[in-house]
């Protein structure tokens, strides 16, 4: 295929822990390869649509743009506008579908290519690609895998659209679900849940905002945990044991989980057993 590209990118955004403003990776790559970059500040006053018309595109490809395109813009390209979404639509429309798939303990997720429509993530499906979620896979690790899957699926989608062989299947809106953006209010671990729910919270909130727990009066970020076969009569959230294997915490119905990696305030991320060598934690 003989393809050429123009890029529309979001403006400068905070992209590190210091909230330093920088270009998006897409814009950086485009500039490095002398690909024209456009950054419309408004989408609904007609100027952005006129810009797209002037470019006379065959197709619009939208990935993680963060803004809904107006209907008149979607009608400009010969082949329409398509999107890559990191879930198996119509499940998990909206923000953070990857994280919520992990948080909810899903075993299967994937990516979807679809045509854009007036409402968010409601357009006709072109292709989907599935993958299993690892039991101890973080959202960040899953993101990296889905990113590659999405790129491969997008390549197939574009080639088949050009060839006229791409399918178009309306979504079953009765099966739709929506997920919200993450925030730090989700971080405190809810110990009065099953061990699997606790572990999925820990792995689902990485790399951000990260699960937290208060242990012996101090708040820790929790990065890794394991299942145990132990039972306890202690209340959820109680420290059952703390030693060479890690820190064992009571959950729902007397079951426990073992925290194996954490980070104390002002300290580096480390194994729980290493932290305990210099900072004993009281058993409840």
Language-model segments: which ranges?
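Short, small-residue-biased leader/transition segments that mark boundaries at the very start
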Residues: 1-9
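Active-site-lining helix/loop region of Rossmann-like oxidoreductase modules
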Residues: 156-214
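Donor/substrate-binding cores of folate-linked one-carbon enzymes
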Residues: 59, 63-178
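Short, structured active-site "lid" loops
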Residues: 23-37, 62
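Internal alpha/beta domain cores that form substrate/cofactor-binding pockets in large enzymes
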Residues: 5, 13, 36-55, 60, ...
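An anion-binding loop in the catalytic cleft
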Residues: 192-284
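Glycine-rich phosphate-binding loop and adjoining beta1-alpha1-beta2 segment
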Residues: 11-28
């Amino acid at each position: 295929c003989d393809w050429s590209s123009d890029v529309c990118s979001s403006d400068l955004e905070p992209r590190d822990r210091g909230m330093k403003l920088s270009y998006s990776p897409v814009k950086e790559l485009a500039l490095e390869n002398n690909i024209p970059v456009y950054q419309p500040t408004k989408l609904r006053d007609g100027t952005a649509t006129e810009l797209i018309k002037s470019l006379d595109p065959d197709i619009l490809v939208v990935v993680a743009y963060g803004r809904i395109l107006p209907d008149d813009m979607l009608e400009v390209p010969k082949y329409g506008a398509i999107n890559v979404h990191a879930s198996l639509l119509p499940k998990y429309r909206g923000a953070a579908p990857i994280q919520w798939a992990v948080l909810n303990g899903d075993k299967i997720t994937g990516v979807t290519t679809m045509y854009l429509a007036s409402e968010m993530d409601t357009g006709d499906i072109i292709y989907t690609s599935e993958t299993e979620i690892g039991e101890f896979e973080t959202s960040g690790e899953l993101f990296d895998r889905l990113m590659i899957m999405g790129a491969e699926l997008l390549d197939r989608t574009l080639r088949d659209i050009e060839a006229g062989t791409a399918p178009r299947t309306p979504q079953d809106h009765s099966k739709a679900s929506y997920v919200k953006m993450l925030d730090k209010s989700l971080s405190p671990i809810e110990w009065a849940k099953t061990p699997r729910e606790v572990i999925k919270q820990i792995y689902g909130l990485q790399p951000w905002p990260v699960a937290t727990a208060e242990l012996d009066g101090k708040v820790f970020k929790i990065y890794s945990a394991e299942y145990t076969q132990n039972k306890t009569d202690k209340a959820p959230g109680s420290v059952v044991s703390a030693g060479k294997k890690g820190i064992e915490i009571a959950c729902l119905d007397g079951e426990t989980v073992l925290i194996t990696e954490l980070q104390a305030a002002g300290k580096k991320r480390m194994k729980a057993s290493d932290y305990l060598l210099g900072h004993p934690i009281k058993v409840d």
